[in-house]
């Protein structure tokens, strides 16, 4: 497919591989995985997407002051703070593209100014849009620099006239000088303040600040592979660390004895509990805690928690922590299934797990982000036999 994206030529940076044929992109990612992870286990061929366009169910656009002082919104040019006006992105869901255009028109009608980062003045910072792939529900999150939002009712009315498919509108206040998009304060302006979507046959509620995979089609491929690697028989206790809104854990619950999910984001934990109830899943519970802290406590001999047979690890891009990995190693589950969106931090964590007596058996890359450098990976690990490895801790005293 020839490149027809205007912003690609303007160096938006959102899809650096757009000019490469898709098979070549997959080859590039395969080579990356092999280089970083091939020493741990055989790397299976990357699972690509049949139609790798308009796959993203979430978009974030930044407001700025455009020519002649007119409000605009778009994406940053690569390596700059220059906002490129938003056009029809080839990666975003087409309804999301249309929604962002409608948000801009409605905001202009309200005469709201863009937030000026250098001066700390203005109102509008970002707009975040989510769309449920199966439900069609659309959530608009307007990120502002202050709580006061004059004319918010007029904005909702104008937006609904231009985009009647929008089902929820939320204001998120982020007054801090920060590169983080979302703040902590949320106010619902219209609708339930969240959307629902169906994934792997289950219904999930998704709130503004909750993590949810951006490519639903490939997410089902990813989770199916993770569940396959877990080899559940219905008798296992499963820990789902970094569980988010409970997607992996709830997908596993129907094949396990019990699931314990751990997540530090309170909104995500509330969503996870609601998702379990909505799907009538009674053998899963979710705990609001830092994954490392909770895993360390659970690994203690007198923790009172059931011994896990399977542990899912699905950390953010920075990977897990040495303390969390040590806790997993101490628990000695039968299997660990590590889901990673960053092969570099995955390689680091696999090195740590290997030193702690674990062995990677299978590595399966999944192309969750076509036309970008990113790739998702699922790894199956099991504990080495006691006589198959030697682990030695050496401490040196003074003068040694």
For the regions a protein language model found, what residue spans apply to each?
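Short, aliphatic-rich beta-strand segments
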Residues: 129, 135-145, 203-207, 310
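Nucleotide donor/acceptor-binding cores
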Residues: 57, 136-138, 235-236
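Rossmann-like S-adenosyl-L-methionine
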Residues: 151-400
